[in-house]
Amino acid sequence: MNDWHEFNAAIKSIYCNAEGDSSSIINRLVGLAMKSEDSTFIEAVLVLKENVSKVDKQLRFLWLTSTINSRFYPPIPISEASPVSWNKTEYCAPGTEELQRRYPGRAKLQNEEDYSGGIEQCRDVPDCSLVASLINLRSKNLNLPLIKQISSTKYHVNLSFNGSNKRLVTVDISQIPTSVDGKQLSLKSNDISDKIGELALLLVSKGTYSTDGSNISIDTYRLSGFLPEITQVNSYPFEKLWKFHKSNLCLMGAGTGNRSNDMIKPLVENHDYSIIDITYDSRLVKLRDPRNSALNVEISYEQYLKNFKQLYLNWNQEKLFKRSQVLHFRYDTSRYNKFSIVADKPLFHLVNNSKVTETVWLLLESHLQDEGSQENRSVSFLNEAPECIICPIEPPVECGGNHIGLQLVKLRLDAETERLLYCYSTTNNNFSIHSFSVVKEICFQRLKDTKSLFAKVLFSFPYEIEGKASFDTCNFFQNPTFELEVHSEQDYQVLMDAACISTSSHDLINIQVYYFNDYELIKPIMFDNHYQPGQGLKQDVPILTNVKYMIVCSTYGPPASTEFELLASIRLSSSWRLISGITLRSVNLIYGTYPYHCRNRFHWKETSDKLKIQMTLPTKKYSTNKLFIRVVPVESSARLRMRCNIFEPESALCVYECQEYRTCPSGGIVIPDLEVSRTNIVVLMIERSVPISSCLPTEGQLDELELFVGSSQKIRIEKYSDDVIPK
């Protein structure tokens, strides 16, 4: 068997290592095969040599997620598995001191060929759902799970978990806890394969006989791969249930849950039962209690509705569908759960390319993790993305599997339509999504290229802003500002959504959208004066592709968080496939787009309504300098009105003229892209329309303003005459 042990080590190394040349490993196995007289070993080496070049990321992912509680369960069909074990221990421990005391011995699993009853649960093993699952499988003459004996005491079993229906589990039947009178911790059955199936699933689930319990849908899926559906007992009318049962397309069970004491006898609470028959004329549901093979309970459909909480269905996907595929991925909460919105989650694209409506089923499977992990406390689900994908996530209305790690989603897609779906989990875990369809025209894939759907940027608020910077203040223009442009080959009008999100719900957030050249922030598109806790959301904003826009994010008070995210997305109904990309980037437009910046504060004299500021330009002859000038009062006031003019002091020639007084907008008064040439000094004259003495007491000091100048070349701001007192 040494050759087989080396074969196992080699195949694990090849499939689990992304890098490295495997040729030396293969050559060594080929050398062993040439010396071997075991035809099975020789064939296994040849198959491995042929398939080693076909190893892709998805298959490697399956191998890398094979370890649970220090045991390795590779994705290998039993027909291709080596006849040796992958793990040192392959039997279950009792689990509790009480079970250890009552079952002190260890003996080989008893083969009860003379037992005449049906499959029956051992009262000391709380696995009624597992036994009920085996009862259902045998009632339909299904020899599942697949089992192969490899020695006198060891068996290979293929179970369905962690993304594969061919997980190889080896069980050792020589170490079964046994009482002094010969009773064993094992179900009763005249077929030892039922006992082996139970042992294999107990080994994988917890490794002991002291289980936490499960349900029929989960255990039937693990044993057979049949698709689990968990729903309320009243989800389907009686006629539907009868059709399901007669179709032989599914296995059925029901759970009482934590019911009240008025439950009819002999039903008990927190117990699963197999549904073994449904009579149409009498509307009777026949149940089998896994604890007693002689006890079949017949109840009316009305009693079924009253006494049971959940209906369990497991669908035979091989009878329902012709095509299937599976995607595997890792969910990292530090990456996907920082902000609770759809766009930040793993996205999946489902397309029906056929000419008719098609049915597609998706199964979201959470991978089993080590004992003590957060798996049992996890919530995970797959859901259709809303039109606005930057909205907060919402669990599906009907999601029976979001707490148990197996969620079945049934969809009907119209001809030549598509759906966008997202996955959410409260904990770190590996996931697999299985898709099933009848026709090959169904395409399901991970949406990794999201540039035509949304763009996002992380940012923090600058600390240099003094005081409030909400849109009703003169500091509003200093908030984080972003350039947005949606690109397409042709020009379209599309609906855009934008969201600014904080990691703190204490932040009150607002976002405004402007045309990019609206430096004074005069005309917001669809102005919204609300500040929302934790997330500012702006929806259905009509914009044109290939046109630049500006987004300004603000908080009502000092930000509580240092981490914010801005997202802009196109509505799914806005032909987002015609979009070639979305650009969203941080920009500083306080000084326009120029590289040189000057900033200073100035006071008006109490006796004057004019303020003159001298700007000294480079003395280089014939040079042209471009200026971006922003004039902002330090205190906001609706009563303060100003006008700005620029002239050459020597010639008194007006370089920029404004005759009307204006109320100062949110972005201040801006003179953009002013070209100055053939002179090295210009004077900015700022005039106000009311004297300071007439301001209201609540308005504070209106005698101070701030000047921001961007320029293509260096300039210097200094006082002109005696009107200016730099501060």
Swiss-Prot record:
Function, in words: Required for the proteolytic cleavage of the transcriptional repressor RIM101 in response to alkaline ambient pH, which is necessary for sporulation and invasive growth. Probably the protease that cleaves RIM101.
Family, similarity comment: Belongs to the peptidase C2 family. PalB/RIM13 subfamily.
Gene name for this UniProt entry: RIM13
Name of protein: Calpain-like protease 1
GO annotation (BP), single: protein processing
Annotated GO MF terms: calcium-dependent cysteine-type endopeptidase activity; cysteine-type endopeptidase activity
Keywords assigned by UniProt, alphabetized: Hydrolase, Protease, Thiol protease
Top-level taxonomy: Eukaryota, Fungi, Dikarya, Ascomycota, Saccharomycotina
Keyword Hydrolase annotated: yes
Origin: domain of life: Eukaryota
Calpain catalytic domain: residues covered: 70-317
Additional record remark: Present with 432 molecules/cell in log phase SD medium.
Organism: Saccharomyces cerevisiae (strain ATCC 204508 / S288c)
